Structures are given as C-alpha cells and as structure tokens.
C-alpha cells in the first residue's frame, strides 16, 4: 500500500529521492526491516498475552531436556504471520498475483495451524486437529494455487514447465499432473517444516535461510538480463516475490530474538505450517521446486527420518514380532538430543548445513 501512496505522491510533486520506491532492492529491504521491527517491538507484549492463555503441555515421549519448557507459550507463529502480512501489504505490489497468492498461503495454513494449536492447548484435544482435516486444508490450498496459476495469463506463459537444477536447457512439463504436483509440494513442504519445529530456533532459522535463497532466485528470475545470462526462465513479476521473501526472512529472524535457546515462545503449528506453505508456493512460482530437496535439505532429511522410522518399525514388527527403530527418536534432531548433543549445538549445526545447501543451490546457477 505504501508503494502506491508514495508513487502517487511522486507523480504529483516529483519529490527528490522518491523514485527509489520503484527499486525492488529498496522495497525488499524496507519490507525486511518492517517485519523485523514489528516482531521485536510487539513481541514481548504479545508473548505475555500468549503466556496467559496458550501454554502447550510437553509430550510424555519428549526428551528429558524438554521438561524445562513446560511454561513456554505456543502460537508465536501469529507474530510471524502478522509481520509478514503487514510488511507485504505495505511494500509489495499487492495487485500482483504472486504477492497475494503467497499472502493467501501464509494466512490459510496459519489458520489451519491455529485451529490445531487451539485444540491442543485450549480444548485439550490430544493430538490437536485430526490429520485428515489438516490434509484437507493443504489440498484445498494446493487446488486454489494450482487452478489459478494454470489459468491466469500471468503464470500461463510457462504453463506447466519447470526447470531442472544442474541442467541448462532441460525442463520438465508436468502436463495434466501439474495440479497434483502443486498439491504434493505444498503438503510435503508444510509438513516438513512442521516436523522440524522441535528445538529452539531450529525451524525459524532454517526457514529464514531457505526463504532468503528463494528470494535471491526470485530477484534473478524477475530480471530479464540476469535470467537470460544465467539461463533460467524470466518470470514477469517474480521480483515482487523477492519483496515478500525478505519480509518472511526477517520475520523469522525477529522471531529468533525470542525463540532462540532458551525460548520464550514457540511458533507452534500456526507458524510452521504457514512458513512451509510459503516456501512451497514461492518455489513453485519461480519454477525452483525441484531444487527444494537440495536447498531445503534439512527439512527433507528430517521428514525422511520420520518416514524411515515409521516404515522400519512396521516392517520389523511383521518380521521379528516386535517393532524396531533406526533412530533413537524421530525426527532426526531428537535422535541427536538422545545421543547427548546439546540443543544449541544441534540447531547451529543444522543452520550451518542449511547455509552450505544454500551456497550449493547458488552454484547450480553456473553448474549447468
């Protein structure tokens, strides 16, 4: 909204320096700063409110170290969502479909996560929202995103094609499977971030790194010169994705101000599902979803560890009459906790891995 107001003022009065509002880098930086300041200045008061109403009980099967977190409030994802939506509304071109589709994804999956958290914390429903209802929410979002991008002329330029990392001129056409692929990616990534949200700062830090990388890709895809030089598809309007991406990055960083160990607040499913859906939608819009197993490798491995644990437990029960485990506990971060690793060490090492994967993803721009 500020973009349109300042642009209108500039057209009327031609004030010196006002033309900077047209620069993506300026608006991306402004959105990032706005998101960060919203959380830092409103965070403490909001945490006090959450603590009076929304303290989630610690699961019995959780590692012993988690017992000391019994009084930490959840639903901190509401702060993240508010900061993202306000920052994007102020600094991005909100009439651009890239922008409002990301904002829709953040809001919708945040709502699903909120219902889940509310049932667990307030209504004391064990396990929260039933898994099939979450799945319905994810599929609904996937259908909306899929059908809209398939039919809207802004997106239909590339139709259902997507790029393949490490290959210069190779692309994949999903064809009639485009919408199922969209649904799968949104569901998989939102669940992956949700599974990773188990240690102080783990999900927020990794989400910030992954989204920053996607923001860089969005900026390059939205620039005809850079995209041509790097042999990646030029996507008109993708630059606005970079503005929203930076808002998400700094909303996560601002949240880390309170969520780093020892955490004062947890994001809950409210935050993890919304961040995961945002990452998925951004990747889909800039045709980098096939890069996610590399870029979002930490989320991918965390999810894989759960799948392997469950599968082997069921298989071994049939083979040996008792369920056996590959890991001490899944997701993987809990395995390392039970092996004696300090929580902060696990989180920082996972951040380092995400940074390495981010750099590897950037290398794919030239390794083609």
UniProtKB/Swiss-Prot annotation:
Annotated protein name in UniProt: Phospho-N-acetylmuramoyl-pentapeptide-transferase
Main enzyme class: transferase
Gene name for this UniProt entry: mraY
TM spans (from-to): 23-43, 72-92, 98-118, 139-159, 170-190, 201-221, 238-258, 281-301, 345-365
Known pathway: Cell wall biogenesis; peptidoglycan biosynthesis
The organism of origin for this protein: Chlorobaculum tepidum (strain ATCC 49652 / DSM 12025 / NBRC 103806 / TLS)
Major localisation: membrane
Any GO CC annotation of this UniProt entry: plasma membrane
Known role: Catalyzes the initial step of the lipid cycle reactions in the biosynthesis of the cell wall peptidoglycan: transfers peptidoglycan precursor phospho-MurNAc-pentapeptide from UDP-MurNAc-pentapeptide onto the lipid carrier undecaprenyl phosphate, yielding undecaprenyl-pyrophosphoryl-MurNAc-pentapeptide, known as lipid I.
NCBIfam families, A to Z: mraY (TIGR00445)
Reactions catalysed, as given in the entry: UDP-N-acetyl-alpha-D-muramoyl-L-alanyl-gamma-D-glutamyl-meso-2,6-diaminopimeloyl-D-alanyl-D-alanine + di-trans,octa-cis-undecaprenyl phosphate = di-trans,octa-cis-undecaprenyl diphospho-N-acetyl-alpha-D-muramoyl-L-alanyl-D-glutamyl-meso-2,6-diaminopimeloyl-D-alanyl-D-alanine + UMP
Keywords: Cell cycle, Cell division, Cell inner membrane, Cell membrane, Cell shape, Cell wall biogenesis/degradation, Magnesium, Membrane, Metal-binding, Peptidoglycan synthesis, Transferase, Transmembrane, Transmembrane helix
Cofactors named for this entry: Mg(2+)
Bridged cysteine pairs (disulfide): none
Membrane topology reported for the UniProt record: Multi-pass membrane protein
E.C. designation(s): 2.7.8.13
GO MF, one annotated term: UDP-N-acetylmuramoyl-L-alanyl-D-glutamyl-meso-2,6-diaminopimelyl-D-alanyl-D-alanine:undecaprenyl-phosphate transferase activity
């Amino acid at each position: 909204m500020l973009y349109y107001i300042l642009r209108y003022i500039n057209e009327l009065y031609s004030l010196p320096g006002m033309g900077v509002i047209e620069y993506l880098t300026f608006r991306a930086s402004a959105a990032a700063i706005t998101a960060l300041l919203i959380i830092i200045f409103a965070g403490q008061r909001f945490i006090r409110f959450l603590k009076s109403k929304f303290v989630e009980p610690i699961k019995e099967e959780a590692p012993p170290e988690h017992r000391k977190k019994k009084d930490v409030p959840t639903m901190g994802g509401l702060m993240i969502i508010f900061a993202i939506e306000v920052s994007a509304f102020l600094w991005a071109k909100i009439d651009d479909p890239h922008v409002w589709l990301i904002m829709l994804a953040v809001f919708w999956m945040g709502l699903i996560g909120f219902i889940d958290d509310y049932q667990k914390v307030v209504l004391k429903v064990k396990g929260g929202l039933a898994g099939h209802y979450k799945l319905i929410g994810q599929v609904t979002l996937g259908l909306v995103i899929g059908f809209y991008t398939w039919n809207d002329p802004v997106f239909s330029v590339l139709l259902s094609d997507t790029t393949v990392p490490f290959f210069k001129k190779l692309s994949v056409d999903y064809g009639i499977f485009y919408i199922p692929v969209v649904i799968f990616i949104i569901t998989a990534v939102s669940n992956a971030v949700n599974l990773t949200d188990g240690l102080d700062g783990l999900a927020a830090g990794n989400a910030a790194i992954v989204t920053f990388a996607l923001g860089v890709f969005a900026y390059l895809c939205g620039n005809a010169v850079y995209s041509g030089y790097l042999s990646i598809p030029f996507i008109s309007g993708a630059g606005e994705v970079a503005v929203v991406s930076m808002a998400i990055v700094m909303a996560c960083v601002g949240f880390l101000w309170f969520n780093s160990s020892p955490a004062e607040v947890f994001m809950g499913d409210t935050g993890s599902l919304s961040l995961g859906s945002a990452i998925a939608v951004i990747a889909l819009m800039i045709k980098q979803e096939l890069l996610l197993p590399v870029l979002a490798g930490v989320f991918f491995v965390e999810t894989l560890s759960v799948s392997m644990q469950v599968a082997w437990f069921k298989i071994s029960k049939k083979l040996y009459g008792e369920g056996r485990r590959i890991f001490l506990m899944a997701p993987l971060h809990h395995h390392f906790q039970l092996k004696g690793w300090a929580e902060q060490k696990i989180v920082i090492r996972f951040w380092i891995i995400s940074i390495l994967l981010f750099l590897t993803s950037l290398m794919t721009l030239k390794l083609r």
